[in-house]
Design a protein with these regions (language model features):
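Conserved NTP-donor binding/palm subdomain of two-metal-ion nucleotidyltransferases/polymerases, i.e.
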Residues: 1-200
Length: 200
């Protein structure tokens, strides 16, 4: 899954990074109904979007728009995040400095990513997401997951979501997702980000 060319460029540009991957990823791809080509998702510790221009100039990558590329040799999609985990203007978790030192999200950060990213991006949990969450929730979830999820969604929504996942209930209503998105608008300057995206 590691793309050597991408990481060579990041090292040359001196951009710290944290790969978004978990210990149950490989097993989870087996439950999809069709052949699944895993993406490379990576958080960069930089406010500069200069890396977008750098990758655009490389023949090894095709630009897909926004912060996404396709690596030509392996036909792998690459999605870049900057400093935090987000879906559009919904920034829900600032990545800890230690994750950039380790070049990988912490398990707590990754679990939160698995909880929120699918419902914000797809409005559902695909089989691969369900598989991963079931495996993580088979053990006691770290307290930090609940704390950080509450800071993003508030106690009521966070508790409701954790209970559903603990019970292997992955049916999330559109109304519940709208409530989550509304709550997220009022953290991390997301409301301003939304206004800017709509005005400009």
């Amino acid at each position: 899954m590691i793309n050597n060319e991408l990481f060579k460029i990041l090292n040359v540009e001196k951009i710290p990074y944290a790969v978004i991957e978990g210990k149950h990823d490989i097993d989870s791809y087996k439950v999809e109904n069709e052949l699944f080509n895993p993406d490379i998702d990576i958080v960069l510790l930089t406010n500069s979007k200069q890396i977008i221009s750098v990758l655009k100039s490389k023949q090894a990558f095709d630009y897909l728009g926004d912060c996404s590329f396709r690596e030509n040799t392996t036909n792998t999609r690459i999605d870049l995040y900057f400093n935090s985990l987000n879906v559009g203007y919904y920034h829900y978790l600032k990545v800890h400095a230690n994750s950039f030192v380790n070049q990988k999200l912490s398990e707590e950060e990754y679990i939160i990513y698995q909880i929120l990213d699918p419902i914000l991006k797809f409005s559902k949990y695909y089989p691969r997401h369900q598989c991963r969450l079931e495996k993580y929730f088979a053990s006691v979830i770290p307290k930090e997951v609940k704390v950080k999820l509450e800071s993003a969604l508030g106690k009521s929504l966070s508790d409701a979501l954790l209970i559903k996942i603990s019970n292997k209930d992955f049916s999330i209503s559109k109304i519940f997702i709208k409530r989550c998105k509304l709550r997220l608008l009022f953290i991390n300057g997301n409301f301003v980000k939304m206004l800017k995206s709509r005005i400009f």
